């Protein structure tokens, strides 16, 4: 009886060992003998699940090690803020309403920040007060190069009443139709006034510059016109004087002068009454030029 029981258990153990050998052939060493998988074996799916669990654990350990190294390399505490509260509300709104088109990488590219910053914004549930928002936004804008002070903006009680009522804000969101709290509305108005101030000053400077240019141009136009008229008059005067001088040089002699030349003067011994014509020019007998026709 004992012999038969030992033989039966030995056969079961050998069969189990054989099945384990067939199932573990995929993870055997380089020197092991390859065997064909047993189609009737029940160990193959279990072995596959075990390998998947092991790979998942390895990936998790690798990610945890990477996070630990990154925390050690970064400065302690929260990273410096680079987004205003209005920008963070836009990020949450776009990711919530248009998750397919506005993914985390696209939001990071659109707002010029890293994907870690976008994930921190989406994960955060902190709701600050109005003073905290203004103070943090002032730090962000000051770091970005905008030195306008928001605290100097006059805020009256009449202005704060509709804000506390929670009216919808038509601020410069990327997608319209969103309703935000009174804190974000006050912050939006403060940012709008602050962003419009430099543009208004620049516009005023451009208008003053254009006005000075127009006045200078208008003052130069009459002077230029007068100089042009003066040059034209000088040109025509010079032309007329040259024409008169040429006409005086080439003008025909009068009839009296011709008669005197032909009759001759008795007191002039060098004068000859003979006139010689050469082409259109007339000379006396001595060869002196008289006139030209």
UniProtKB/Swiss-Prot annotation:
GO terms for molecular function: rRNA binding. One of its GO terms (cellular component) is mitochondrial matrix. Residues 1-15 form the signal peptide. Glycans are attached at residue 270. GO terms for biological process: cell differentiation; mitochondrial ribosome assembly; positive regulation of mitochondrial translation. Pfam families: Neugrin. Forms a regulatory protein-RNA complex, consisting of RCC1L, NGRN, RPUSD3, RPUSD4, TRUB2, FASTKD2 and 16S mt-rRNA. Interacts with 16S mt-rRNA; this interaction is direct. Belongs to the neugrin family. This is Neugrin. It comes from Rattus norvegicus (Rat).
